[in-house]
């Protein structure tokens, strides 16, 4: 009887320590399809127009073309940005009068930025709607839930 009781206690402990059984495991392609559906729904529900998309699911709209000087991998970029979730909650922004500095192609920012910033020129502005696989994927943080589609408005201030 004690042995049976010990086994039951052990099983309860093991199952209570496991990950939430409500989590759904998706393949990358399934998640991308879901993200694209969310993005297209967001665009439609908000009556947005003028967006283009890439095969990787990145949707974008160039608001200002800039001066025809495009960034290349290895360039240092100064950008101003605002990031938000599809529900409109802002999770990050660059400081006023202090652009964010990054090196394009270095991997220090999410893939969606690495790809999207090559679509605008110096002094240009773009809106990027980034599927989770080009952002933080299944990783969550305090302000960004796992598998979140992210929206960024980015102005490329300077290329060095």
Language-model region placement:
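Sec-dependent signal peptide recognition
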Residues: 1-10
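C-terminal motif of bacterial Sec signal peptides marking the signal peptidase cleavage site
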Residues: 12-16
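Cross-family detector of peptidyl-prolyl cis-trans isomerase
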Residues: 17-160
């Amino acid at each position: 009887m004690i042995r049976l009781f010990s086994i039951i206690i052990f099983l309860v402990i093991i199952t209570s320590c496991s990950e939430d059984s409500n989590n759904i495991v998706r393949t990358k392609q399934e998640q991308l399809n879901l993200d694209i559906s969310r993005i297209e729904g967001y665009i439609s529900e908000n009556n947005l127009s003028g967006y283009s998309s890439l095969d990787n699911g990145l949707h974008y709209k160039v608001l200002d073309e800039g001066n025809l000087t495009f960034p290349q991998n290895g360039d240092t970029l100064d950008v101003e940005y605002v990031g938000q979730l599809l529900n409109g909650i802002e999770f990050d922004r660059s400081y006023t009068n202090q652009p964010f500095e990054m090196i394009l192609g270095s991997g220090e920012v999410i893939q969606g930025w690495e790809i999207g910033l090559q679509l605008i020129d110096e002094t240009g502005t773009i809106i990027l709607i980034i599927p989770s696989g080009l952002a933080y994927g299944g990783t969550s943080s305090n302000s960004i839930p796992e598998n979140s589609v992210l929206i960024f408005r980015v102005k490329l201030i300077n290329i060095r």
